[in-house]
Amino acid sequence: MADAAVELPGRLAILPFRNKVLLPGAIVRIRCTNPSSVKLVEQELWQREEKGLIGVLPVHDSEAAGSLLSPGVGSDSGEGGSKAPGGSAGESTKQDTKNGKETIHWHSRGVAARALHLSRGVEKPSGRVTYIVVLEGLCRFSVQELSARGSYHVARVSRLDMTKTELEHAEQDPDLIALSRQFKATAMELISVLEQKQKTVGRTKVLLETVPVYRLADIFVASFEISFEEQLSMLDSVDLKVRLSKATELVDRHLQSILVAEKITQKVEGQLSKSQKEFLLRQQMRAIKEELGDNDDDEDDVAALERKMQNAGMPANIWKHAQRELRRLRKMQPQQPGYSSSRTYLELLAELPWQKVSEERELDLRAAKESLDRDHYGLTKVKQRIIEYLAVRKLKPDARGPVLCFVGPPGVGKTSLASSIAKALNRKFIRISLGGVKDEADIRGHRRTYIGSMPGRLIDGLKRVSVSNPVMLLDEIDKTGSDVRGDPASALLEVLDPEQNKTFNDHYLNVPFDLSKVIFVATANRMQPIPPPLLDRMEVIELPGYTPEEKLKIAMKHLIPRVLEQHGLSSTYLQIPEAMVRLIIERYTREAGVRNLERNLAALARAAAVKVAEQDSVLRLGKEIQPITTTLLDSRLADGGEVEMEVIPMGQDISNTYENPSPMIVDEAMLEKVLGPPRFDDSEAADRVASPGVSVGLVWTSFGGEVQFVEATAMVGKGDLHLTGQLGDVIKESAQLALTWVRARAADLNLSPTSDINLLESRDIHIHFPAGAVPKDGPSAGVTLVTSLVSLFSHRKVRADTAMTGEMTLRGLVLPVGGVKDKVLAAHRYGIKRVILPERNMKDLAEVPAPILSGLEILLVKRIEEVLDHAFEGGCPLRPHSKL
């Protein structure tokens, strides 16, 4: 208990309390674990036979409250210390942050305390020493100077509380006597109320009758749960009259809170019956609102929702619809089944961006072009079309631009191009994945009559981005399906039609929403699965696969830096030379895009990361890490008003890095060790075309161009044609056409009927397309099928360095096909040197990079006879044939 006769020494060791105040007369228990606090307790309390006094000084999280002191760190003699302004307790200064130390806001006033109990312990297995100290507050003091002594602080202090003689003289003051009576009366009333609930208040009643009132003010307030600012206010109240006045106010407030709680409890219990027990919590809430003078049960939720809807900026007709729904919601109880669904619907109306848009900055086409060139290598025509699109937007911002649909194999940058458009327009970007969507409700939403109904993906996406004019990417639009639940592609017709999407009607929303401000961009791997009406609403931009040189540039400029960053590495740890990247492209990846290339680079980075992480030598990033010299305290309230404070150190971030004397350079040995033996080699075609009946074709798939081998054989049978390899109807018809043409021209092809294989009699033909798990279809394998059959029947091998593509007619004409660029790139990837193409596809060769064309021999043909002449070594002599 506070003692007016305590002799206060000139200097006190300071124990900081964070966001908590020890008042005179109060008793607290603290647990000291921090090294600086442990050092203070050992030197000032544990090692001394006569336990001295220590100072408890509050520490602020910020300088906003109370009187602050700026400590300096100096010697015990005061050098470098920080002096408090004399007599100006309300002034404050702020400690400068040096060497990254945290600013400490010390309060300028504290309480001298003595240890009533002290115990020492050792934690296992760490062996850390801890102390539990029970402290009693004695008297207030003011800090004149604060300095450091080793790892803790000491302060030069002066007493603030009155001495015994001064107190005896002050007790004769009539105003103080009146305040004392008022405080005791309020405190006694509080004790009377608490006696009905607690049996331990008897001791408090004895204290009230025996202890001087100036001591009771601090003791009573210390037992209440009050804010840190109010605790500081009591600590700063040196004048007895001010202290008693504040204490009386706090005691009275505590009393009133207890009385109000009792009143609410009595009112609720009086209204409850056995059938109403389940509404206990709701009755209590209603009673609390009545005490506050607020009888509107929906003010906190429904009224707030209404204000949010008013600020949403929805059109007048939709606002009327929302008001009707809101009135319906007000009439419902929260327990009713439709309450939650109705509320969720109104929240959606309030959150939709009816008027909110992204502010477009003035388009800078030069900057947009530089950004596209920086983020995407190659794709010259595609980037030029995007620049044209942006130029039109600049000249006519309200123009209805076309819906761009990027079609190309995976990994060529379709999604990132859409993101670049959003970046150039300064609009928000959202991606809607349509892969595997088979339900029309995913686009239009579910009707609200269904349980668990929700809006469609478009409306939900607009709610998430919170603007009505984003760039919306409809990803994998060719992967949608249809079943009994509807066709999502048909629902997209309204979305992508500029004449209709201004009044798009989502089934869940049930009111029109304007989608005309949205810029739609779609991506697909193939055009064929997209329904023609939907395809007609989009402008298709084809993205071909990358050439090996383009892949090399992309890897060196984009992929390798990104992979190293993702794995916590840099060029000082791992270096991948261009030659090794080229080997990865040629031997480990054969794709149109660069995803597999990135995966292989990531495998190399992971292998390097293991080597780096296994190193034993560790270097600190910070070479001079300062010791923690100041401790903040984390406090919490315990039962009975007792405070237990856990001493913890301030947070300090100390980072480590790994020492790597020399970078790891990837070579062929490391490639084989990490990636395994090469998956592809240039001799694959030669090995597979080693016998008659095998030819090399070129096909286009959703993954880009590919090399397709065709194998044929014959056996005794009934003249049937067998086809295997998961083939579609078109390619089956091409095989039938090829066999018919070969049989019809057998004599011209010098295929003797007396040979081991007679084309005109009982022989079955089996044609197989390897990679049987991959579906295949299309007419471009016609010339390849004819070449394979002629090779089979003539016992001549097809040239292994030659690949071909083209549709043929029954009269032997070779018709043009699509995907020429991708097919030529595929031939180049496989090491093919000669490519046979329809002559009418010559215009498509302009899209093939010149370095690729220079390494290939392109053979343009009009008829199938020319194909056969180029496909066999030494040509294929034909007899004159009819021109019919």
From Swiss-Prot:
Subcellular compartments: Peroxisome matrix
Biased composition (Gly residues): 75-89
Region spans: Disordered: 67-101
Domain of life: Eukaryota
GO BP terms, alphabetized: lateral root development; protein import into peroxisome matrix, docking; protein processing; protein quality control for misfolded or incompletely synthesized proteins
Enzyme class: hydrolase
Identification of the protein by name: Lon protease homolog 2, peroxisomal
Organism in which the protein naturally occurs: Oryza sativa subsp. indica (Rice)
